[in-house]
Amino acid sequence: MTEQHQPNLELDFAAHTNDWGEEPNLVAEPALDQAVEVQTQPVAERQRQITAKIQILQPVEQVWQVLTDYEALASFIPNLAKSRRLEHPTGGIRLEQVGTQRLLRFNFSARVVLDLEEKFPHEINFNMVEGDFKAFSGSWLLKPSLAEQAGTHLCYSVRVWPKLTMPVAIIERRLSSDMRLNLLAIRQRVEQLFATAS
């Protein structure tokens, strides 16, 4: 962890907006932007719980496959510069991720190390063990759709406690935007990989 880093506001999956580094190909259509439901809730002073949800028209197992291909995440998640597995002291799953983005005409980056717990095929919990936040934890929840067509309700929830170097209002706004874009990128990736197979 280095002092010159500013929180990237999205530990593992980063974000957009014009002056901040927009990814226009994923938000060109307002209908896409509305496909993601985002809720923000203060949980303590300078701490926020942010939850984003999306419907993906592919089975849970295929969404799980995309989420758990950890080393490939940087190839399709906006502004995620690096995602790689590290050796875990007890044999679990540990990731190092580096996000970069342009914020107010400056480039910022953040490095985090996450420990993950997988509960196949419905839940992935993560907790930051080292990085540029005071605390960052959350989960991915995958539930099968009850509709006739196979589908997945994907829910991404994070609890963030930023360091004092970044105003919490900016982080809240950034994370909400980031999470929306990340879920759209995941849905797009799942559809690219599996739509022709179904």
PLM features per residue range, with description:
Residues Q34, I50, Q97, A110-V112, ...:
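One face of beta-strands
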Residues T51-I54, S83-R85, A110-L116, S137-P144:
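Hydrophobic/aromatic beta-strand elements that line small-molecule binding cavities or substrate pockets
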Residues T2-G91:
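Hydrophobic ligand-binding cavity/cleft-lining segments
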Residues Q4, V43-R46, R84-E130, A185-A197:
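Glycine-rich portal/gate segments that line the openings of hydrophobic small-molecule binding cavities
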Residues W64-Q65, D69, L175-M179, I186-R187:
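Short, well-ordered alpha-helical segments
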Residues Q47-Q49, T90-G92, S109, A135, ...:
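A general secondary-structure signal for short beta-strands and their flanking turns/coil
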